[in-house]
Amino acid sequence: MVTIVDINANTPLRPRHPEKVNRPDSVSPAKPAWIRVKAPTTRGYADTRNIVRENGLVTVCEEAGCPNIGECWDKKHATFMIMGDTCTRACAFCNVKTGMPAALDAGEPEHVAEATFKLGLAHVVVTSVDRDDLADGGAAHIAETIRAIRAKCPTTTIEVLTPDFLRKDGALEQIVAAKPDVFNHNLETVPSRYLSVRPGARYFHSIRLLQRVKEIDPTIFTKSGIMVGLGEQRHEVLQVMDDMRSAEVDFLTIGQYLQPTKKHHAVMNYVTPEEFSNYETVAYTKGFLMVSASPLTRSSHHAGEDFAKLKAARDALAR
């Protein structure tokens, strides 16, 4: 008899990652000093957590085990993860729960708007789990969330970090029509690593998704990111930059992959701060308006400040 246990001590009855339970443990090298972060203990962190709980919301900060949660929540910055806490994909790098999700909460867009208002966010980031079980991948729900935030917080700028909507015709168009200020879709890794890291996705589909946003509405900023430390080569990272620029992506993020549990993909290497700095320099020479590359860079880390820089960079080009 096989005993199924929750590898994150969630519950012995329902594994958080059932597809990973019987995998052998993978070993990652010890974290270097530049990766260490402080435990979250501040009053601002507690206030943000309370607002999230009061509105019954899920955040990617918690679900994905983001190392920056203490810093961001202390400043009352949170990234809302909508459409539930269970993803229909099973990416090898991700700590979000996998399985069959619950039905959508029709009141969620209003709850997100209310939390955005209570936190006083000048810039809000909304992401989601993949919902391959829905005909439109949840696109209408994301669009409704954008509209709800606009109605409640008209001066707040909105960034969405979306799934790939693979085989979901018309889904992307619904979100673009809702006019987020930033459309983010992460490539996550280089093409050669997709089969082992992101097997449910298709690299060139994701590139085309980003390109299509610009074709529909060139005024929307586009953004994408990758993790390093998954076994990629430097020349592959540079090729991803070129592919993104061919799709007119404005903003690139590059961060260090950190292994959530021993059942997830191992960290193959830790990229040094100097290497990240070099990636950033090269990316700017390729034409990105904004680049964030560092060991702890994540898609929504410093998103508000980075949006202001992104807008200023485009305004400068228009002069």
UniProtKB/Swiss-Prot annotation:
Biological pathway: Protein modification; protein lipoylation via endogenous pathway; protein N(6)-(lipoyl)lysine from octanoyl-[acyl-carrier-protein]: step 2/2
Molecular function in Gene Ontology: 4 iron, 4 sulfur cluster binding; lipoate synthase activity; metal ion binding
UniProt cross-references to CDD domains, sorted A to Z: Radical_SAM
Record's catalysed reaction(s): [[Fe-S] cluster scaffold protein carrying a second [4Fe-4S](2+) cluster] + N(6)-octanoyl-L-lysyl-[protein] + 2 oxidized [2Fe-2S]-[ferredoxin] + 2 S-adenosyl-L-methionine + 4 H(+) = [[Fe-S] cluster scaffold protein] + N(6)-[(R)-dihydrolipoyl]-L-lysyl-[protein] + 4 Fe(3+) + 2 hydrogen sulfide + 2 5'-deoxyadenosine + 2 L-methionine + 2 reduced [2Fe-2S]-[ferredoxin]
Domain Radical SAM core: 73-289
SUPFAM superfamilies per the UniProt record, alphabetical: Radical SAM enzymes
CC cofactor: [4Fe-4S] cluster
Entry GO CC: cytoplasm
Pfam families assigned: Radical_SAM
Subcellular location: Cytoplasm
Main location group: cytoplasm
Keyword Iron-sulfur annotated: yes
Gene3D superfamilies: Aldolase class I (3.20.20.70)
EC numbers for this chain: 2.8.1.8
UniProtKB keywords: 4Fe-4S, Cytoplasm, Iron, Iron-sulfur, Metal-binding, S-adenosyl-L-methionine, Transferase
Binding, [4Fe-4S] cluster 1: C61, C66, C72, S300
Family: Belongs to the radical SAM superfamily. Lipoyl synthase family.
Protein name per the record: Lipoyl synthase
Biological source species: Bradyrhizobium sp. (strain ORS 278)
Gene that this polypeptide is encoded by: lipA
